[in-house]
């Protein structure tokens, strides 16, 4: 009991402070770590005064705990105390917001969008890939059709419906881009949709 009393008197610290801050075990809780961060320099000096430099250097658990506190203390010191103009903190500038991308207008003079069954769309897209023009393109396909005949793939006719892309069809039909711009299926669907719109417009006029 007497050595403990002498130790407390030499350090000038109450017993509670010695027991709280001079533990030899690594910090295990957030509260302990926070205490060691704030009083990092004092804790290290108290341990060296209590244990001696030899114990701090050669005792592995003690050395690890001291090194841990040194790293934490140095980090806090460099971030706050050692920073120039410590009292004049300026908010970190936020990066400027990127300029909004310009809206891409629909290329209405090159293609249209009409819903088609997914199975037919996959089949037609596969056909487009396998029939893309290379060295073996036949003169007939290169010539294509006379006049305006919808989309083309290097001279080959193609349905202008971007969801369809049909290359082969019993006949080409009129679409939003003109005559023979849609395949047979898309042309029929487009015509029926136009008829439904016309009927709805008639009903609206009669109601008014």
UniProtKB/Swiss-Prot annotation:
It is found in: Nucleus. GO terms for cellular component: nucleus. It comes from the Eukaryota. Pfam families: GATA. The keyword DNA-binding applies. A zinc finger (GATA-type) spans 155-208. One of its GO terms (molecular function) is zinc ion binding. Its main location: nucleus. InterPro entries: Znf_GATA, Znf_NHR/GATA. Keywords: DNA-binding, Metal-binding, Nucleus, Transcription, Transcription regulation, Zinc, Zinc-finger. GO terms for biological process: regulation of DNA-templated transcription. Belongs to the type IV zinc-finger family. Class B subfamily. PANTHER family: GATA ZINC FINGER DOMAIN-CONTAINING PROTEIN 14-RELATED, OS01G0976800 PROTEIN. Transcriptional regulator that specifically binds 5'-GATA-3' or 5'-GAT-3' motifs within gene promoters. This is GATA transcription factor 29. It comes from Arabidopsis thaliana. The lineage of its organism: Eukaryota, Viridiplantae, Streptophyta, Embryophyta, Tracheophyta. The gene is GATA29.
């Amino acid at each position: 009991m007497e050595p403990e009393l002498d130790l407390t008197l030499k350090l000038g610290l109450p017993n509670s402070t010695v027991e709280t801050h001079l533990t030899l075990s690594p910090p295990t809780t957030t509260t302990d770590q926070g205490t060691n961060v704030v009083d990092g320099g004092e804790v290290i000096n108290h341990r060296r005064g209590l244990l001696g430099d030899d114990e701090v250097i050669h005792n592995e658990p003690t050395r690890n705990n001291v090194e841990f506190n040194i790293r934490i203390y140095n980090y806090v010191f460099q971030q706050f105390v050692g920073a120039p103009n410590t009292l004049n903190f300026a908010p970190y500038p936020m990066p400027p917001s990127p300029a909004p991308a310009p809206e891409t207008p629909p290329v209405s003079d090159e293609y249209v969008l009409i819903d088609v069954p997914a199975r037919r769309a996959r089949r037609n897209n596969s056909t487009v890939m396998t029939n893309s023009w290379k060295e073996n393109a036949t003169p007939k396909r290169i010539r294509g059709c006379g006049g305006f005949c919808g989309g083309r793939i290097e001279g080959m006719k193609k349905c202008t419906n971007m969801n369809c892309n049909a290359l082969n069809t019993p006949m080409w039909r009129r679409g939003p881009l003109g005559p023979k711009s849609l395949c047979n299926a898309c042309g029929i669907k487009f015509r029926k949709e136009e008829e439904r719109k016309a009927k709805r417009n008639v009903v609206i006029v009669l109601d008014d």
